[in-house]
Amino acid sequence: MVVGPLIAQEEAPTFREDQIYLSIAYPYFSDAPNTLIQNKLSYAFSFGFVRDMPINKQRSLAVGIGLGYDQATIYNNNLFTYAGNNISATVIEGGYQQNYLRMQSLAVPLELRWRNATETKHAFWRIHTGVSVHFPMQFKSYNQTPTGQINTAKLPSKGTILRLNVHFGFNTWNISIAHDLQPWAV
């Protein structure tokens, strides 16, 4: 029998906060002309995945990068058309059944992430901030008149859209605020 001190390496924590996200939001035009009025319940939803890459020993700071899908549907009172490289918006005077703008994009979020989590503490506070790069897939206008006539228009987008994001939350719930740095339309 041998008696002596045992020496072992302390195991480093290995947890990370990889995230599968699903969000529902209310989109709002912050700089729309006075003639554009949002109506009904406009909505946006997104889903995706963010890979967490801790950058300190405590694993309380991390960088996140992900991939997702984003769609916003904004009900409003304007008929949007595209002709001759020009988008025009006209207030609909005679009524309509349904009228909206729909924007769909592929999103790549880049985040700086803070949390007060440990390897065994699963209910914790978090703040994530960063940008998401959006690659527009579709930008269109849809209008249905009271007689049932349907008008659609594919609208050109400016290309890549940058969006500032701030997410804060506790445990499984987050509140998010986002702002596009440039308009979608050309």
Name every feature range the model reports, one short phrase each.
Residues 33-40, 74-84, 89-103, 136-146, ...:
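Extracellular/periplasm-exposed beta-strand and loop segments of Gram-negative cell-envelope proteins
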Residues 47-53, 67-69, 108-116, 129-133, ...:
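Residues on the lipid-exposed face of transmembrane beta-strands in outer-membrane beta-barrel proteins
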Residues 16-18, 39-45, 102-108, 123, ...:
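Residues that define the transmembrane beta-barrel architecture of outer-membrane proteins
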Residues 9-17, 54-61, 117-125:
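Short loop/turn motifs that connect adjacent beta-strands in outer-membrane beta-barrel proteins
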Residues 11, 153-186:
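Predominantly the C-terminal beta-signal and adjacent terminal strand-loop region
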Residues 8-52:
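Short glycine/proline- and aromatic-enriched beta-strand/turn motifs that initiate or cap beta-hairpins
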Residues 24-30, 67-75, 114-116, 131-139, ...:
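Transmembrane beta-strands of outer-membrane beta-barrel pores
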